[in-house]
Amino acid sequence: MRLFYRLLAIALIAATTFAVSCEKPAPLPNEKSMAVTYSALDGCWQLTMWQGASMAEETYLYIDFDRREHRYTMWDNIDSMYATDTTGTFTITEEEDGTYTLSGTYDYGVGDWSCDYQVILWNKGKSMKWQSRNGSHQVMDFVRVDEIPEFN
């Protein structure tokens, strides 16, 4: 049930942002991107922008990708004042056009992510952009971080 409310909150944020914004999704970076591999994605990432807007100071989402197990753990407080964690598996697929797709599933039979994402890595693997592939125009910017803060 907690996951339902989290997904509902994310959907409401996305719908609100989409409804009040007349802008097209943020363009993908012009600088040369690097191959999106399990090794390149491995490690800790912090969401810094959603739909072109910076995250509110008290709101956060961190995700830690494990290249060996193809698993992730995500910590966020998007729909709660307390940290929640979500786990699951992810896959990376290179498309015929040379782009990369990131898709995933949640643990405990919750199901698949709401959409797949085109992923671009740049800035020597320190920056990452996700853009939804299902037409919903979701755009998320991440930066690599050394570690994820401890949440109590």
Task: Please state what every model-predicted region is.
Residues M55-T101:
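N-terminal glycine/threonine-rich, aromatic-flanked beta-hairpin/loop signature
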Residues F18-S21:
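C-terminal motif of bacterial Sec signal peptides marking the signal peptidase cleavage site
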Residues E23-P25:
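Bacterial signal peptide processing site
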Residues N30, D85-E95, S127-N152:
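Edge beta-strand at a domain terminus
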Residues M1-A9:
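Bacterial N-terminal signal peptides that target proteins for export
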Residues G98-I120:
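An anionic, turn-rich surface loop/hairpin at beta-sheet edges
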Residues L28-Q46:
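N-terminal helix-cap/turn-to-beta initiation motif at the start of protein domains
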Residues L41-R71, T105-W113:
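Short, solvent-exposed loop/hinge segments that bridge or flank secondary-structure elements
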